[in-house]
Each structure stands twice: as structure tokens, then as C-alpha cells.
């Protein structure tokens, strides 16, 4: 554990609610939400910021869970004393999405009627449902209006949804490396990942036991991880170099890297959750052009939209489309395209320019 600039040891908390009526009419009961908080809520409760995570993220956005942790939370470079999301000024909340597998209600949760994990019996969850659950959590903390909702990738979709579903519940919205709806290509990559899981002999219609479809999930992660990097970054990192070690498994270093990413992912994620969350991504749509402008028309908050030059999963054009529609709807929006060779994952990585942009947006509300 390296405490330099960190907020230190953090405990994951759990909030339970009686029920949540989902968009499709299903009732999820009870509902558990895993979350973490950083900083102190002001007496007027006007300094709260909600951070929304991406597909494979969780509630652990900053700090450490124990002194033996080797790595801090996934956005520790941006959350903490004096950082972009300054815990000396703001009360930061990050929760695991429902449908996920890091403590919130999802396929791994115990079905109250069977006393066994839901598995594929868990109801379909949408981005809208994820946001509904977050709203329950925020209200339970006594917060009527968030100072900001921020997120990258899938987290950016959640932030967008907050702005239109609860327009009077946030003052600022930060959308990074995201989109208002998936293109056919983006859906295609997710479908390949899902099919890899479904074709695993251990899938068992989503009602698997401890012998889970690890091979299928690893392949899904390998496919997904390709889209998180850029061509330049892969060329720089791997080129056409041979792998180290067993050359029978793969001919190139990039293949060895992807195999490692897949194998390590299955130890921290659930195959059902991967299917549920990617389907939520694919089904989310605010439309295009006039339809998108209309969808954003009731938003009242200020927006910051950030894209990355080398992001080919959610390319800058999709961010510019959001910006164009916000401007057409006469909303206050600031747009930045950061030059980065890191691909889609750029929003997760430490970048002095990004730190400056986020901090400046939050500290200068006018």
C-alpha cells in the first residue's frame, strides 16, 4: 500500500431497500447496493458527487481496503485530497451497479425463493434501472441534489441518464469516453463476448455452480480488451514480438498479454453479470440527431463532455454528437478532445491535462 496522496483505508458499505420496480415491470426485492464514500458531506448536503463506473468497475474507486492492498481503487489518481474530485471539498459516492457482481444485487445474489444464486433467473437490468438504484442510495443518504454526476464509458451513459431522468437532482454532469447509444459495431463486439460465454460447456443455461464458464468469460474479456487499447499503443507495447515462455500457446506477445488479461479477469468477475451488463449497454439509446436533442431537452445541469483522439471503441464523433445535441437544446456544455495514444482506457489513466480539466470544471461553475 502506497499512501502518497491517497485517502487511505476505505470500507465498502451496503444499503438495502425493500424493492425496485424495473423498467420492464419486474420487481427486484430486496435490493442491495454496495457503495463507498470519500470525504465529508457538508451540513447543507450540497457538495456530493456521484461517480459512475464502467463495465468491469465497482464501488472501490479510491483508497485501499487494507494495508496489504497492492493497488488502490480504479480512479485513485482523480479522487482524494487536492485531486480533481477533491475530498477536502466534496463528498464522493461510488456504488456498484445492480446486475454487477461486486456486492450489489445481481446474478450472484441469493434468490429469496430458492436460497440459491439467481444466475440467469435474475431480471433484465437496464442503464435506467442502474440509475434508479443509485437514486435510492443518494436519497437514503439525505441528499436531494448532487453537485455532480460523473463517469466514463458505461459510467458516462449513467451520467447522461441522470441528467434526463432526474434533471432537478444534479447541478453538473461529466461524460467521458462515452456515447448516447451503441453502434452496430459496438453491439457486435459485445455479442461475440456473450457468445463465447454461451458456448462454454460450463454455461449450463446460466445456472452454473462453482464450475463457472471461465474459458468463455476469458475469451469475452480478450475481445473486449482489444477495444480498450489503440493500434499505436499495441504497436508500441508489443509490435510483432514473440511471447515470453511457452510459444505453443500463442505466436505473439500481444496474444500472451490478452490471454493473461482474460485469465485474470475470471477471478474477479461473473459470466452472468458480463452478459447482463453488456446487454444493458447495447439496449441503451437516447437516439441520434433531433431525437437525441429532444431526449436531452429537459436537462437543467451544466455538462462537460470529454473524448480521446485514439479511442476507437467510443470515438470522438460520438461525443461530438452528444455535444451538438446539447447545444441544439440550448444547454451549457463544454467539450474537450484530449490527445492520447492510450485508446478507450485513456479516461482511467493519470493525465495531468485531464486532472486540470476536471478540476477546472468543478471549481468554476460559471
Swiss-Prot record:
Keywords for this protein: Acyltransferase, Amino-acid biosynthesis, Cytoplasm, Methionine biosynthesis, Transferase
Catalytic activity of the protein: L-homoserine + acetyl-CoA = O-acetyl-L-homoserine + CoA
Family classification: Belongs to the AB hydrolase superfamily. MetX family.
Domain of life of the source: Bacteria
The enzyme's E.C. designation: 2.3.1.31
Protein name listed in UniProt: Homoserine O-acetyltransferase
Gene that encodes the chain: metXA
Organism field: Leptospira interrogans serogroup Icterohaemorrhagiae serovar Lai (strain 56601)
NCBIfam families, A to Z: homoserO_Ac_trn, PRK00175.1
Gene Ontology CC: one annotated term: cytoplasm
Catalytic residue positions: 153 (nucleophile), 311, 344
Function noted in UniProt: Transfers an acetyl group from acetyl-CoA to L-homoserine, forming acetyl-L-homoserine. Utilizes a ping-pong kinetic mechanism in which the acetyl group of acetyl-CoA is initially transferred to the enzyme to form an acetyl-enzyme intermediate before subsequent transfer to homoserine to form the final product, O-acetylhomoserine.
InterPro entries named among the record's database cross-references: AB_hydrolase_1, AB_hydrolase_fold, HAT_MetX-like
Quaternary data: Homodimer.
